[in-house]
């Protein structure tokens, strides 16, 4: 699964997810893409499950690009722990996604194949997405 090799700081604030994506909202590498319509924290597990779904559907047909990376650590405390004594340990990593961000791109396959692969992939995600093509 995806996670940073090293970070400047071990823990982060949660922060807000206001507005739309200003970067990463156009197709850069492939011909077809999966674009988000809602804000979300995508976990490394969700990204990996989606990647595997697309890869299995297109087999060796096309090239796939993952346009997101989980670089935000989410901490959690053990169950039944008293308050205090600092912030919990890093539990998992998430990618902060705003509406309009491109998640996956695909090239080298037909439009029908790409559309079906992205449809199956969208079932693995907790948000609404849309299939877009390069102009």
Curated annotation (Swiss-Prot):
Q: Where is this region: Disordered?
A: 1-22
The annotated regions of Basic residues compositional bias extend over 1-17
The family database entries (Pfam families) matched by this protein are listed as: Ribosomal_L16
Identify one Gene Ontology CC term for this UniProt entry.
chloroplast
- GO process annotations (BP): mitochondrial translation
Where, subcellularly, is it found?
Plastid, Chloroplast
Q: Which SUPFAM superfamilies match?
A: Ribosomal protein L16p/L10e
- Would I find Ribonucleoprotein among this entry's keywords? yes
Q: Which UniProt keywords apply?
A: Chloroplast, Plastid, Ribonucleoprotein, Ribosomal protein
For molecular function, the Gene Ontology terms on record are: rRNA binding; structural constituent of ribosome
Task: Read off the InterPro entries from this record.
Answer: Ribosomal_uL16, Ribosomal_uL16_bact-type, Ribosomal_uL16_CS, Ribosomal_uL16_dom, Ribosomal_uL16_sf
| Entry annotated with the keyword Electron transport | no
HAMAP family named in the record: Ribosomal_uL16 (MF_01342)
For this chain, the family text in UniProt reads: Belongs to the universal ribosomal protein uL16 family.
Subunit relationships = Part of the 50S ribosomal subunit.
Know the name of this protein?
Large ribosomal subunit protein uL16c
Which species is listed as the source? Gracilaria tenuistipitata (Red alga)
């Amino acid at each position: 699964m995806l996670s940073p090799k090293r970070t400047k700081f071990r823990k982060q604030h949660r922060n807000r997810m206001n507005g739309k994506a200003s970067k990463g909202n156009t197709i850069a590498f492939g011909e077809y893409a999966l674009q988000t319509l809602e804000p979300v924290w995508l976990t490394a597990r969700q990204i990996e499950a989606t990647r595997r779904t697309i890869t299995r559907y297109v087999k060796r047909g096309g090239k796939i690009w993952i346009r997101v990376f989980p670089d935000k650590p989410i901490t959690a405390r053990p169950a039944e722990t008293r308050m205090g004594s600092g912030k919990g340990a890093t539990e998992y990593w998430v990618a902060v996604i705003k509406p309009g961000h491109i998640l996956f791109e695909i090239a080298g396959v037909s439009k029908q194949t790409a559309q079906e692969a992205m449809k199956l992939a969208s079932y693995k995600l907790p948000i609404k997405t849309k299939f877009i093509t390069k102009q």
